[in-house]
Regions:
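Short, high-confidence coil segments that cap the C-terminus of an alpha-helix
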Residues: 26, 79-80, 107-111
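Short internal beta-strands
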Residues: 30-34
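Short, well-formed alpha-helical segments that are part of the catalytic scaffolds
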Residues: 11-25
């Protein structure tokens, strides 16, 4: 089975649900804790959750490039293992068992698997409150693809890879030693998307997301992608702090299965 690596920062309440989602398909979870200052209380929150961090690092707020460096560093501790790289608000879903996908990759010389975001939101485009007891599937019954058309954010993700395979900032592409990356629809080391394209169900959109998006926008740093966050914040504000579920570009649909995530449930995944 693969390992899992994730980085958790100021938003910890999705983390228990995320770890629960992966627990039966991974060998071990490696949790890195991102402290934003020396008096950041996140370590106490992680302790309350019963999680032992693999690594703790302190960095200025919203440095997504540093987060990616941490992912690459931790994966290198077991370079020949397979790893799932998942942010703490992402629940990845594969079209077949992960062990079968890894076997296919080993047999054909593929070194990484890719996918894309599905944005999960509440009824009528709202941003629900999440606690440890929340049933994510029923609380976020809508899935769509709105962040890219809304603000131009890259929707691609590298989800499963060998430990030595580095990823670019945001985990959007595989990064190679010659300075190139896996941008494009095909790469000889990439499992073809016709065989596997991972759904990354993004539960970013909870009751705290507007405040968090505003903070990143106000950070005004290139490494935070603050310009994109400002566009996103303004678009959400314009729609009364909800997602416009009637916007056809956002491809918002009701998920039929509300006890788990069914890969074939979302009708526009093609």
């Amino acid at each position: 089975m693969p390992n899992l690596v994730t980085v958790v920062g100021e938003n910890t309440h999705i983390l228990p649900h995320m770890l629960k989602h992966y627990e039966d398909v991974i060998d071990k979870a490696y949790v890195a804790v991102y402290r934003q200052s020396d008096d950041d209380g996140i370590l106490e929150e992680i302790e309350e959750l019963g999680i032992e961090p693999f690594m703790v690092f302190t960095e200025p707020k919203y440095n997504w490039e540093r987060v990616t460096e941490i992912y690459n560093t931790i994966k290198q501790t077991k370079p020949n293992d397979w790893w799932i790289v998942s942010d703490d608000d992402e629940l990845q879903v594969y079209p077949e068992p992960i062990e079968d996908i890894i076997e296919n990759c080993e047999r054909n010389g593929y070194e990484f698997v890719t996918g894309g975001f599905l944005d999960r939101i509440g009824i009528d485009g709202t941003f629900p409150k999440v606690t440890r007891e929340t049933d994510l599937h029923r609380t976020f019954p809508l899935a769509g693809f709105f962040r890219h058309p809304m603000s131009g954010a890259c929707p691609n993700k590298v989800t499963l890879m060998k430990g030595y395979q580095k990823v670019t900032s945001g985990q959007h592409y595989a990064s190679f030693n010659d300075g190139t990356n896996s941008w494009g629809t095909e790469h000889k080391r990439r499992m073809p998307i016709e065989e596997c394209f991972t759904q990354v169900h993004h539960f970013k959109w909870d009751s705290t997301c507007v405040e968090r998006i505003k903070k990143v926008a106000d950070n005004k740093k290139d490494y935070s992608f603050s310009d994109e966050y400002k566009i996103m914040y303004d678009a959400i504000k314009k729609n009364n702090f909800k997602i416009d579920t009637n916007n056809l570009k956002f491809l918002v649909e009701d998920m039929k299965e509300l006890s788990y995530i069914e890969y074939k449930d979302y009708p526009h995944w093609d």
